[in-house]
Amino acid sequence: MYSNKKRQAILLALLAAHCTFYGTNVTAAPVPVTDGKYTADGTDTYDPITHTDTINSIKVSNGAQVSVTAGATTVNGVNSSESLTASSGGQLTVNGSLNATVGLGDTYSTGVGYSGIVANGSGSKIILSGTDNSITSKSTNYKNSESAFFAYNNGEIHVTGDTTTVKVSQSRIVAAQDGASITFSNG
């Protein structure tokens, strides 16, 4: 029979192995996000990313796939461009309810517009499927097509949860161009 310490060592080794190989095509263990910015590149699949603290932004690109499965996700992206971003074939899915403040203040003098939730490029997708989403856009540069949701270059944004509340100041709610699509199929 194994001693208690030996049993604990075996269990910890098994747990570590499970974490290392969790998911599909994973080259690194799933990464818990607790603060700041999360950036996913390459072909890694991180599923799930669970966290309880506020995130400044999530940017997914180059075919990476990120699934956020926490019960509630809070994103405070004020004064950061493209707080939730999928580009170059990246896919971001938020399964839990999303409470996000996104966008940048007035940048018209610089000729630069910043939207909040952005999908750019063919195969790039953002899917919000939480039951109660609340999006507040702080963008104020209406003339540069700033919006709470912005899809372009064949990017896709799909909102499929039960209820989504969007508040804007001077920006658009949605903007899509160059073959992109934004769909709201929630109740």
Residue ranges and their predicted role:
Residues 1-27:
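Gram-negative bacterial Sec-dependent N-terminal signal peptides
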